[in-house]
Amino acid sequence: MKTAWLGTFAASALLVAGYAQADADLAKKNNCIACHQVETKVVGPALKDIAAKYADKDDAATYLAGKIKGGSSGVWGQIPMPPNVNVSDADAKALADWILTLK
């Protein structure tokens, strides 16, 4: 019984790690990392800071996906985030969901 539980736990951990890596790869693929890093402000805010700012917002993933696709200005300073028209709706949602998991 203990072995089965440990196996399930290990499989779950690998699944979560794979999900996190897949969306980090998605951020690289869509060139998000040119302006954003997980821990550090570059041109745009650190992704962990974005996650913290919107952690309690009910529709945070939808809101962030819209910002990823449509861009924004004045939210995090003077440098605007350009729209990312080549990012699919599904990828924008996956990126937003991933960002919100960062602590």
Curated annotation (Swiss-Prot):
It comes from the Bacteria. Gene3D superfamilies: Cytochrome c-like domain (1.10.760.10). Residues 1-22 form the signal peptide. Keywords: Electron transport, Heme, Iron, Metal-binding, Periplasm, Signal, Transport. InterPro entries: Cyt_c-like_dom, Cyt_c-like_dom_sf, Cyt_c_ID. It is found in: Periplasm. Disulfide bonds: none annotated. GO terms for molecular function: electron transfer activity; heme binding; iron ion binding. PROSITE patterns: CYTC. Heme c binds at C32, C35, H36, M81. GO terms for cellular component: periplasmic space. Pfam families: Cytochrom_C. Binds 1 heme c group covalently per subunit. Monomer. Monoheme c-type cytochrome. Probable electron donor to membrane cytochrome oxidase and to periplasmic nitrite reductase. This is Cytochrome c-552. It comes from Nitrosomonas europaea (strain ATCC 19718 / CIP 103999 / KCTC 2705 / NBRC 14298).
